[in-house]
Amino acid sequence: MAATLTEAGTGPAATREFVEGWTLAQTLGEGAYGEVKLLINRQTGEAVAMKMVDLKKHPDAANSVRKEVCIQKMLQDKHILRFFGKRSQGSVEYIFLEYAAGGELFDRIEPDVGMPQHEAQRYFTQLLSGLNYLHQRGIAHRDLKPENLLLDEHDNVKISDFGMATMFRCKGKERLLDKRCGTLPYVAPEVLQKAYHAQPADLWSCGVILVTMLAGELPWDQPSTNCTEFTNWRDNDHWQLQTPWSKLDTLAISLLRKLLATSPGTRLTLEKTLDHKWCNMQFADNERSYDLVDSAAALEICSPKAKRQRLQSSAHLSNGLDDSISRNYCSQPMPTMRSDDDFNVRLGSGRSKEDGGDRQTLAQEARLSYSFSQPALLDDLLLATQMNQTQNASQNYFQRLVRRMTRFFVTTRWDDTIKRLVGTIERLGGYTCKFGDDGVVTVSTVDRNKLRLVFKAHIIEMDGKILVDCRLSKGCGLEFKRRFIKIKNALEDIVLKGPTTWPIAIATNSVP
């Protein structure tokens, strides 16, 4: 019998069964080639994230799926999102991964503000720990950014999205990479210019991530001569007076000057980065890298002019660039395969030279076993081919909602919530709304660099209350958070306030 998804219950909170005993609770993310679903085992309560890619609809995704699975089979580390297995059903590929209940790292970054230094330090050192594991095994990630760093239920970093990863070292022999890939604000300058070493390029991305965590904004749109902010940094030309640098203290700056050295040969290694004083300083819980009240740069930091080009992905790439440079950002956990139109600029006419060596190497290196700590009854997911009817499992919905700050409960009924939400967004101007029968409002707009920004608002009825759950679909994560705050503030009169139940507090990330 062909695999199909059977629905149980009715209305926006209906759940469906994937295989017997495993219920589809919600959509976690989506991309050009498929969706990521949350699966819950009704017997054990365990949760798994499942990527679905239909290769009949997207035949160009086949190589990306194969490569991602090959690499993730090799990885078993506490700061790497765990791979549980893969299953094929007809033309559809199902990839089963660890469920990161803490959400995306970008959701913890307050736009234009960042986060306290002790939090940034913790996330940063965990990122470096996971990256060290990858590099020791000869694997480069090549698309590190806050949207690809997930958090588990204990707030530990999990590196995800290995669609652009590759092996740069095998049997002790290291090779240069020549494929230009990644997300423009985070890629190292040498990636846009020539063949490059893998490790310094990944470390550059870590440096940009640290800037966004400390300052709540990106330092530049792209590391090229076309970007004034970057050339000022490169040429040591009055960059100290500009944001985000004017927000950071001298200790953080001393680390970033070495980590974001434009010459990969003088850039800090991973080991020296971890040895830097900033990574070992004991920060107070509420200490930020700057003080908005006392800083002489406060007015500049908060001015519209200073923010105008922050947190935006780059303008269009020049026609000389290769494929796989992403201009947009993906919400957690997005499928790693991306299309030309939605996520990457595919300008190269042929395959990169480095692709040829990956297939055999990965096949030789990949282990056949699944990752450690895999859920009980996982074989049901990997082997079952027949779908069965299920009972409604909405009682587990609260507990399994990924923690996200971009959601809120309202006091209105389901129908009234839809009307208020759509009406409010349209009155704000500059948005296009489309409402689907599944209770999802798709909101489209453009950011300040005229790049597409799409997010979805799911209107979910649960436990007698209505949840407005917003998530990014395409575009910059922090720009999405800015728009969300404006919309939520405009709906303030219907936002649920006051004491809430424990499950509601967990779902909305508002645990006292």
Swiss-Prot record:
InterPro entries: Chk1_catalytic_dom, Kinase-like_dom_sf, Prot_kinase_dom, Protein_kinase_ATP_BS, Ser/Thr_kinase_AS
Residue spans crossing the bilayer: none
Post-translation changes: Phosphorylated in a MEI-41/ATR dependent manner in response to DNA damage or the presence of unreplicated DNA.
Origin: domain of life: Eukaryota
Keyword list, A-Z: ATP-binding, Cell cycle, Developmental protein, DNA damage, Kinase, Nucleotide-binding, Nucleus, Serine/threonine-protein kinase, Transferase
Enzyme superclass (EC): transferase
Phenotypic consequence of residue 143 to A: Abolishes kinase activity
Sequence similarity: Belongs to the protein kinase superfamily. CAMK Ser/Thr protein kinase family. NIM1 subfamily.
Full protein name: Serine/threonine-protein kinase grp
Organism, scientific name: Drosophila melanogaster
